Swiss-Prot record:
Name of the protein described by the UniProt record: Glutamate--tRNA ligase
Function: Catalyzes the attachment of glutamate to tRNA(Glu) in a two-step reaction: glutamate is first activated by ATP to form Glu-AMP and then transferred to the acceptor end of tRNA(Glu).
Gene name for this UniProt entry: gltX
Taxon lineage: Bacteria, Pseudomonadati, Pseudomonadota, Betaproteobacteria, Burkholderiales
Residues that, per the record, bind ATP: K246
InterPro entries membership: aa-tRNA-synth_I_cd-bd, aa-tRNA-synth_I_codon-bd_sub2, aa-tRNA-synth_I_CS, aa_tRNA-synth_I_cd-bd_sf, Glu-tRNA-ligase_bac/mito, Glu-tRNA-synth_I_codon-bd_sub1, Glu/Gln-tRNA-synth, Glu/Gln-tRNA-synth_Ib_cat-dom
Organism annotation: Burkholderia ambifaria (strain ATCC BAA-244 / DSM 16087 / CCUG 44356 / LMG 19182 / AMMD)
Length: 469
């Protein structure tokens, strides 16, 4: 009988989380949702010196922002130490593990001799119990590590969902340390116990874990567990072709939110960063879950492309509800010095956002464009001298008169502009540029008629009249 699908995301909270990391959460999340299974969040925090609550919070915040909800967890390895010690004791009792008293200095010397002899450096089994073998006398006052009795013969084989069939001879694997002298268990051991206890059926993770897999499979089988399906994802490269990392300039997941990206755009982009569904570039979260499979995971490293993500974000911004975008824009407006009172007494932010979003690739850009509606204009003196000339002043005066009498609609404002152009034999930029400067404080705005309608008749008329006085 097929086991119910159970996947996991098992990050180490030792630093910030970037897109390459969070992709290892997205794919197992999607597979669990597709298969009506269970998605488990496990925090692998046994590296006490490097782990931090701040990093845990960043993981949880990033997952929440992207909508990667988990069914179980977060489960912390440090809270499972009693269980690990129980299994270690069981392995010692059953002869699956043994104490090793070889010191770090002795191990280094052994490896150096092996290198000089042209051999692969590895533990030589000095303290491994064998029938008829006489072990050295344990040195006084030395606490041993525990090593797993790896099979000496045979081959570890698994059918990786990405890499295909992988075979590793047991002769290439030495007896792995599974507990330190103070009794604390090692990562590779904890992972096996966790995956077994949590009935994980599919392990979807980065291919930097491939070398751990044969060791983990051997420990799992020794404990009577059934190996999961493994899918080792190729590395995510940055735009320079290096492995994505903080050291090489990767942004944290939440930095994308803070730069004005929408979570649905990031999820869509991440989904395509190592998986494909035909030629589909843009798809909803629901479509992604429906289409996701392990068979179409990419076999080559995927390279991050910021311009592609920006293009996707621009698409989702155009599709997004104006009220939602307005709420998202407020923190950016606040950072630009626009106070809540100015927004409350100015043009409706929903409408302003609706006008600005077609020109923006991020919510931050929407806010930067929207700010002119909530500030007193301070146009550049050189720009004023260039555009608000004596030749155009009569046209501005006529435009003000027309706007005072017009219905306050985009169509009526457009008609007033065109009528003024005709009367004074001007081209649109000759009139629109000074109007933009005087009303908005900048020459860069969307369609002038739409902008004037949002500013409102009183503001438009008073600002142009003030310049003509």
């Amino acid at each position: 009988m097929t086991r119910p699908v159970r996947t996991r995301f098992a990050p180490s909270p030792t630093g910030f989380i970037h897109l390459g990391n969070i992709r290892s959460a997205l794919y197992p999340w999607a597979f669990a949702r597709k298969m009506k299974g269970t998605f488990v969040l496990r925090i692998e925090d046994t590296d006490v010196e490097r782990s931090s609550q701040e990093a845990v919070d960043a993981i949880l915040e990033g997952m929440q922002w992207l909508g990667l909800d988990f069914d179980e967890g977060p489960i912390y390895q440090m809270q499972r130490m009693d269980r690990y010690r129980e299994v270690l004791a069981q392995m010692l009792e059953q002869g699956l593990a043994y104490p090793c008293y070889m010191s770090a200095e002795e191990l280094d010397a052994l490896r150096e001799r092996q290198r000089e002899a042209g051999l692969k450096p590895r533990y030589d089994g000095t303290w491994r119990p064998e029938p008829g073998k006489v072990l050295p006398e344990p040195p006084a006052g030395v606490k041993p590590v525990l090593r797993f009795r790896n099979p000496l013969t045979g081959t570890v084989v698994w059918d990786d969902a990405v890499k295909g069939r992988v075979e590793i001879s047991n002769e290439e694997l030495d007896d792995l340390v599974i507990a330190r002298p103070d009794g604390t268990p090692i990562y590779n051991f904890c992972v096996v116990v966790d995956d077994m206890d949590m009935n994980i059926t599919h392990v979807i993770r980065g291919d930097d874990h491939v070398n751990n897999t044969p060791r983990q499979i051997n420990i799992l089988r020794a404990l009577g567990g059934e190996p999961p399906v493994y899918a080792h994802l190729p590395t995510v490269l940055n735009e320079q072709g290096e492995k994505m990392s903080k050291r090489h300039g990767a942004m944290s997941v939440m930095a994308y939110r803070d730069a004005g990206f929408l979570p649905e755009a990031v999820v869509n982009y991440l989904a395509r960063l190592g998986w494909s569904h035909g030629d589909a570039e843009i798809f909803t979260r629901e479509q992604f879950v429906e289409w996701f499979d392990l068979e179409h995971l990419g076999k080559s490293p995927a390279q991050y492309d910021h311009s592609k993500l920006s293009w996707l974000n621009a698409h989702y911004i155009k599709e997004a509800d104006n009220a939602r975008l307005a709420a998202l824009a407020k923190p950016f407006l606040d950072a630009l010095g626009i106070e809540e009172a100015a927004i409350a007494t100015g043009p409706a932010l929903d409408a302003v956002v609706g006008l600005m979003k077609d020109r923006a690739t991020t919510v931050k850009e929407i806010a930067e464009g929207a700010a002119m509606f909530y500030r007193v204009p301070a146009p550049d003196a050189d720009a004023l001298a260039q555009h608000v000339t004596d030749a155009v002043r009569p046209a501005l005066a006529d435009l003000v008169a027309a706007l005072k009498a017009a219905d306050w609609t985009k169509e009526a404002v457009s008609a007033a502009l065109k009528a003024t152009l005709g009367t004074h034999k001007l081209k649109m930029p000759q009139l629109a540029m000074p109007v933009r400067l005087l009303v908005a404080g900048t020459t860069h705005t969307p369609s002038i008629d739409a902008v004037l309608v949002l500013f409102g008749r009183d503001v438009v008329v008073s600002r142009i009249e003030a310049a003509l006085a």
